[in-house]
Swiss-Prot record:
It is found in: Membrane; Cytoplasm. This is E3 ubiquitin-protein ligase RNF182. One of its GO terms (cellular component) is cytoplasm. It is a multi-pass membrane protein. InterPro entries: RNF182 (IPR042285), RNF182_RING-HC (IPR047986), Znf_RING (IPR001841), Znf_RING/FYVE/PHD (IPR013083), Znf_RING_CS (IPR017907). A zinc finger (RING-type) spans 20-68. It is an enzyme of class 2 (transferase). Interacts with ATP6V0C. Keywords: Cytoplasm, Membrane, Metal-binding, Transferase, Transmembrane, Transmembrane helix, Ubl conjugation pathway, Zinc, Zinc-finger.
Length: 247
């Protein structure tokens, strides 16, 4: 008994939403279809035709009678404006505020007209649309539901990338070790070369004549070899230049 007074205002509010706020006639599925303007106000198609006939609006544009917002008419036809699908569903169900469930409640087709009709006309802007998506429980066999199945996918390209990365690391380490060894050897040879003269003199004083002569003659012999190499290189260049000249 206590719920009856609460249900009556709800029913009256639902019936008010089913009426055009200009002519106060009830919407229907024929001449008075609820059309949604870009400002989200609802007007029946018959009133929109009257507004166009009065010439109050520019060509191809409808001025909202409530907020004076201009709505462009696609193809200059009122029928091209989106319908308020919520009102149409309510009219299809009898206009008593009952909810009609579609045949497939898990699917919802979203189109620009559908989204425009889903926006409540009481809001001044339509920047936000909240869509609640609920997970549907699907029937499955007991054996599959009791045993969790986890599948891991490992692409073959990942193994090849790992192998290439490992080989590249080994190659870098080997190259670095080789370069370090070459540098150490060059430094040792340079130290031995520049210290060969005092070392040879020391060996001669120590009466180690053979080694002393070898170390003492290392620097002069290397200088002589470099001079001979440079002289031979100059002679070869001159000879090649003479051969290249046309006869």
């Amino acid at each position: 008994m206590a719920s009856q007074p609460l249900e009556e205002p709800a029913e009256s509010q639902a019936s008010d939403e089913l009426e055009c706020k200009i002519c106060y006639n009830r919407y229907n599925l024929k001449q008075r279809k609820p059309k949604v303007l870009e400002c989200c106000h609802r007007v029946c198609a018959k009133c929109l035709y009257k507004i166009i006939d009065f010439g109050d609006s520019p060509q191809g544009v409808i001025v909202c009678p409530f907020c004076r917002f201009e709505t462009c008419l696609p193809d200059d036809e009122v029928s091209s404006l989106p319908d308020d699908n919520n009102i149409l569903v309510n009219l299809t169900c009898g206009g008593k505020g009952k909810k009609c469930l579609p045949e497939n409640p898990t699917e919802l087709l979203l189109t620009p007209k559908r989204l425009a009709s889903l926006v409540s006309p009481s809001h001044t802007s339509s920047n936000c649309l909240v869509i609640t998506i609920m997970e549907v429980q699907r029937e499955s066999s007991p054996s599959l539901s009791s045993t969790p199945v986890v599948e891991f996918y490992r692409p073959a390209s990942f193994d090849s990338v790992t192998t290439v990365s490992h080989n590249w690391t080994v190659w870098n380490c080997t190259s670095l070790l080789f370069q370090t060894s070459i540098r150490v050897l060059v430094w040792l040879l340079g130290l031995l070369y520049f210290s060969s003269l005092p070392l040879g003199i020391y060996l001669l004083v120590s009466k180690k004549v053979t080694l002393g002569v070898v170390f003492v003659s290392l620097v002069p012999s290397s200088l002589v070899i470099l001079m001979v190499y440079g002289f031979c290189q100059c002679v070869c260049h001159e000879f090649l230049d003479c051969m290249a000249l046309p006869s």
